[in-house]
């Protein structure tokens, strides 16, 4: 039987050098680590890792080749009260595995035990890691490096974006390949998108609870192998990495960046009753935040929380991020529940992972976007991330909806959000682009549902409609649900236009939810994380071409307005912005706080956004000059010069002089 050589303690994971494979695994509390390899017949062969450098276990298997399937058995104490849950009866996934063979099905054998260990061996059904070789011709690929001030983000799900697209070949719909298909790329280009932000593509598992209900985790925020691509999005699991890189290369050639939504805050092992896949059995005490009683701190709402202040876990997370940039050429990351990244356990801007990213010559050069909260005390950290990060701006989301749909936001508060929420983000040298403005996202109502539903309708999720937020700031305009009279449809359309205009012509970085530009509805489900079906897949055959054209025209208009593209804070008298009332006069303090919802925003001294958010048609006197409405609010031919705009109720228009 072949013996393992000692090998090297770096890099993490399994790496083929042309002669064999070097294996490394971190565990500070293990007493022994077995590498388990499986031949073509499924026969298991075990080898003790002979090298032990600090907390890194390592060994080298001569003559091993790509395609080899493997896992680990890690020996150590079973001491739940101290946070130790070693169980060598369970085959474990390498946290740095690049490919996984097998499915993460609900099975009692994939649990380690709660108070007492479950000593039933699970190698026969446990997923296996696969050694991969990294050969890929990137040709002349180069990152677009779109300036932040010019960035337009489009948030999309790999499968949902293309699964029903009639112009994409059936055999590649819903896959990585479809992202790089000319039809998809041309659509994004015509829309004006500069960055495609993908919901998680790292391999994830469906929670046992969902599997028992016949559902699955659709969004992907339940990671199990952070270096491996989710195989269900590939035409062939064996070529997933190649297909993904082909798509990125094609998108880059079109000048479109790719941003990955990444989940570093928790794992698919969930709470102590959850499955055992990897980290819990490798070194539970190091990888997770552990309470004094040995249970997990659940600061994520998912059962566990990764300890991103532990040096080894920081190294793991940093290596993962570098892998996606260096191996797949991604252009940035959106970090789910990113407050966890700064926990020590209190949130700190100089937390170890933040410092590691800032000091990394690779990671410090890509786009970094935080979802700036978690669910623990002190978890709401909007505006408090280090300067390298942009942040989801929920202040903007709520303000835009309240202003246009609830009519209860003063002009001053609306203007503050329109101006990149400078009261929140103008600190530590940050620029307006740090505010990622959004009206909708994958989590919550779609834009169409915001104007069609007053209440969430999540019954299909199997939780009796208890899940999902009740704070939607939506307005069904008088009838719950889709459809209705022509008048109702038109009023809803006007509200959609107002929200899109506010999003795409505000200072800051706009993020558009895929499907909002053509009227996609989830029928009132505002938490469709487990709906892998026509509720979430974009139905291109029903797309509103008029709304798509409206959205594209707004993005095109945004790119013509210097005040929105220069990415610098607006200052009094700098010519970037003037705030005027319905009579084209500066607003008084009382008008800002208590005045009617009528406002004129003059940008770059040439572009005027006139707003009438009242219930009545109102005359708006435009500033001096020859003004004409511009697309998408008027045709390009035969512009009509006007001095007074008859502002419809809840309406707005953009003029140029």
From Swiss-Prot:
Active site: 336, 371
GO BP of this protein: glycogen catabolic process
SUPFAM superfamilies named in the record: (Trans)glycosidases (SSF51445), E set domains (SSF81296)
Transmembrane segments: none
Function summary: Removes maltotriose and maltotetraose chains that are attached by 1,6-alpha-linkage to the limit dextrin main chain, generating a debranched limit dextrin.
Keywords from the UniProt entry: Carbohydrate metabolism, Glycogen metabolism, Glycosidase, Hydrolase
Catalytic activity field: Hydrolysis of (1->6)-alpha-D-glucosidic linkages to branches with degrees of polymerization of three or four glucose residues in limit dextrin
Pathway: Glycan degradation; glycogen degradation
Chain intervals for the UniProt region annotation (Disordered): 460-479
Protein name as catalogued: Glycogen debranching enzyme
Stored Pfam families: Alpha-amylase (PF00128), CBM_48 (PF02922), GlgX_C (PF18390)
Species per Swiss-Prot/TrEMBL record: Escherichia coli O7:K1 (strain IAI39 / ExPEC)
Gene Ontology molecular functions: glycogen debranching enzyme activity; hydrolase activity, hydrolyzing O-glycosyl compounds
């Amino acid at each position: 039987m072949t013996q393992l050589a000692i090998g090297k303690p770096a890099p993490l994971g399994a790496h083929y050098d042309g002669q064999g494979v070097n294996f490394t695994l971190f565990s500070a509390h293990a007493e022994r680590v077995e590498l388990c390899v499986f031949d073509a017949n499924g026969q298991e062969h075990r080898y003790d890792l002979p090298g032990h450098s600090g907390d890194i276990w390592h060994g080298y298997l001569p003559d091993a080749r790509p395609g080899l399937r493997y896992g680990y058995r890690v020996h150590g104490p079973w001491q739940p009260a101290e946070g130790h849950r070693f169980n060598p009866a369970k085959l474990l996934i390498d946290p740095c595995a690049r490919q996984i063979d097998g499915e993460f099905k609900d099975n009692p054998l994939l649990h380690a035990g709660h108070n007492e260990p479950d000593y039933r061996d699970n190698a026969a059904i446990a997923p296996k890691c696969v050694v991969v070789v990294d050969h890929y011709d990137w040709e002349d690929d180069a990152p677009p490096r779109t300036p932040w001030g010019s960035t337009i983000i489009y948030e999309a799900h790999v499968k949902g974006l293309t699964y029903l697209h009639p112009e994409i070949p059936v055999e590649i719909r819903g896959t990585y390949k479809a992202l790089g298909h000319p039809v998809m790329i041309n659509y994004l280009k015509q829309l004006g998108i500069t960055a495609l932000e993908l919901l998680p593509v790292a391999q994830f598992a469906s929670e046992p609870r969902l599997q028992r209900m016949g559902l699955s985790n659709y969004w992907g925020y339940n990671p199990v192998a952070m270096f491996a691509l989710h195989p269900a999005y590939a035409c062939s699991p064996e070529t997933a990495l190649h297909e993904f890189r082909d798509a990125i290369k094609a998108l880059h050639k079109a000048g479109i960046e790719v941003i990955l939504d990444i989940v570093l805050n928790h794992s698919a092992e969930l709470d102590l009753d959850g499955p055992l896949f990897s980290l819990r059995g490798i070194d539970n005490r190091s990888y997770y935040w552990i309470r004094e009683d040995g249970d997990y701190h659940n600061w994520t709402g998912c059962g566990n929380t990764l300890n991103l202040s532990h040096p080894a876990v920081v190294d793991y997370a940093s290596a993962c991020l570098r892998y996606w940039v260096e191996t797949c050429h991604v252009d940035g990351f959106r970090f789910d529940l990113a407050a966890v990244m700064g926990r020590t356990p209190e949130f700190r801007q100089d937390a170890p992972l933040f410092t590691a990213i800032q000091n990394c010559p690779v990671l410090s050069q890509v786009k970094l976007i935080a979802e700036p909260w978690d669910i623990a005390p002190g978890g709401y950290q909007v505006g408090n991330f280090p300067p390298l990060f942009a942040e989801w701006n929920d202040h903007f989301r709520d303000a835009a909806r309240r202003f246009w749909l609830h009519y209860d936001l003063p002009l001053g508060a609306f203007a503050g959000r329109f101006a990149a929420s400078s009261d929140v983000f103008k600190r530590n040298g940050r620029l307006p682009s740090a505010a990622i403005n959004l009206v909708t996202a994958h989590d919550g109502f779609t834009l169409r549902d915001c104007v069609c539903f007053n209440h969430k309708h999540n019954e299909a999720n199997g939780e009796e409609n208890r899940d999902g937020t009740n704070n939607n700031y939506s307005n069904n305009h008088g009838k719950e649900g889709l459809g209705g009279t022509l008048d109702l449809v038109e009023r809803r359309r006007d509200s959609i236009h107002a929200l899109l205009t506010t999003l795409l012509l505000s200072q800051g970085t706009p993020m558009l939810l895929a499907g909002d530009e053509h009227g996609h509805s989830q029928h009132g489900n505002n938490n469709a994380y487990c709906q892998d079906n026509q509720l979430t897949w974009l139905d291109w055959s029903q797309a509103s071409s008029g709304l798509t054209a409206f959205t594209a025209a707004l993005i095109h208009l945004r790119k013509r307005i210097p005040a929105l593209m220069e990415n610098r804070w607006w200052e009094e008298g700098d010519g970037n912005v003037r705030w005027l009332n319905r009579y084209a006069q500066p607003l008084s303090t009382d008008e800002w706080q208590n005045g009617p919802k009528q406002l004129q925003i003059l940008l770059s001294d040439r572009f005027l956004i006139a707003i009438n958010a009242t219930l009545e048609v109102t005359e708006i006197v435009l500033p001096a000059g020859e003004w004409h409405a511009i697309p998408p609010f008027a045709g390009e031919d035969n512009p009509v010069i006007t001095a007074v705009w008859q502002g419809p109720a809840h309406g707005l228009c953009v003029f140029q002089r």
